[in-house]
Amino acid sequence: MQGLIDCGKYKVTEVLSSHSGFEAALCSDVTVNDGTVYIVNEYSSMVYIRELLQLFCAMEKQRFRGFRGLITSNGSFSAVFVYRSGVPFAEYFAERSGDYDTNLGLADSLLRGELEFDLIDDRTAACGLTCENAVVNAAEGQVYFNMLLDPDRTAGENFRTKRLGGMLRMMFRTDRYFPDEIAEYIEKMCSGGFRSCTAAYSAWREIQPSAQKTREAYLKESLMKYLGRRLRGSIKKRRRRHGA
């Protein structure tokens, strides 16, 4: 973090990750002292500098939410982002069975908040849009991504929506009252059925009225009616698998 020391603006409070040519740390701005915490990603490998500096410059022009700018130093550069407090995403949903309506709101926050990832390049999006970077702020009803950007992270085709689909799977308990519309939507997300976060969020909003009606109907149905519905669903899936 020599660049931070040289600029005299940030103080390192905790190192989060470090390997050859890369270091990420939590920092405070000593010139303001307003309590805001930042994640600073420093790249000192010439390979990383050549590959990434232009991408971060483009991100800065896009005014990516939470991006506070670049710090350049002799032999390195750093990208500074606002840090969001919260419970790590996987930990939050592992410890809570979850209220459906609460999780529905968090899912909307997740999908709405990640529209900006469509605006940036695949390399930096692959580093930032990960379950490990996500936190849940239950008091605000929001899901945030803290931009710890390890340059060695990679991703395949349609990784944005596939990763979000995997996170949605973690959020919901698919019991007898779970709407088919949302279950099918998550499956489509995980299989790469959406080309962008924007397309995925648009589809999400479109299914909400019918999903709400379906859930209301399922909450009222008898056990026998549910068992019949489940049997019909199993037969339909079997036929699809066999191409009937």
Feature map (PLM): residue ranges:
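Activation segment of protein kinase catalytic domains, centered on the conserved DFG
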Residues: 93-109
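C-lobe/activation-segment region of protein kinase-like
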Residues: 121-239
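Short acidic, S/G/P-rich loop/turn micro-motifs used as interaction or catalytic elements
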Residues: 43-47, 86-87, 150-153, 173-174
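Short C-lobe core helix of eukaryotic-like protein kinase catalytic domains
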Residues: 108-122
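ATP-binding glycine-rich loop module of kinase domains
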Residues: 1-66, 93
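Short beta-strand micro-motifs within the conserved protein kinase catalytic domain, predominantly
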Residues: 66-78
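Structural motif in protein kinase domains
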Residues: 84-94
